[in-house]
């Protein structure tokens, strides 16, 4: 009986780790509430899908903006800074893009939202593994 309990608990622990929640950040970008989700937590070296939801001051989804994701790793001894940019595609109420993090370490991410000629940005940092 004791073995069965230990086995069941181990199985639940492994299942919980395998079903990890997305990496999620909620911040303000100017007048907008922005939620960014990366499909891997923690983000990994290689392709990572990012989904961005933007709401205006009245709580309505913003679907008429141009959204660009810029991601960079600062320079290190013997290595220049790495700077990348990817455009997003609107699908439903979410802007979606793919980021390719080329190495492990700390990455700075900026979500730039341009709407009616005005640009706002939300910045956060992730640690790719």
Predicted segments — roles?
Residues 1-4:
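Positively charged n-region of N-terminal signal peptides that target proteins for export
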Residues 7-15:
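Bacterial N-terminal signal peptides
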């Amino acid at each position: 009986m004791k073995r069965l309990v230990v086995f069941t608990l181990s199985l639940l622990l492994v299942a919980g780790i395998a079903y990890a929640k997305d990496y999620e950040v909620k911040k303000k970008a100017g007048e907008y509430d922005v939620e960014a989700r990366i499909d891997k937590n923690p983000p990994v070296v290689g392709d990572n899908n990012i989904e961005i939801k933007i709401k205006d001051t009245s709580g309505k989804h913003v679907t008429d903006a141009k959204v660009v994701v810029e991601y960079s790793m600062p320079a290190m001894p013997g290595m220049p800074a790495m700077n990348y940019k990817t455009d997003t595609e609107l699908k439903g109420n979410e802007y979606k893009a793919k980021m390719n993090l080329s190495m492990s370490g700390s990455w700075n991410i900026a979500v730039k939202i341009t709407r009616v000629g005005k640009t706002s940005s939300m910045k956060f940092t992730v640690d790719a593994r």
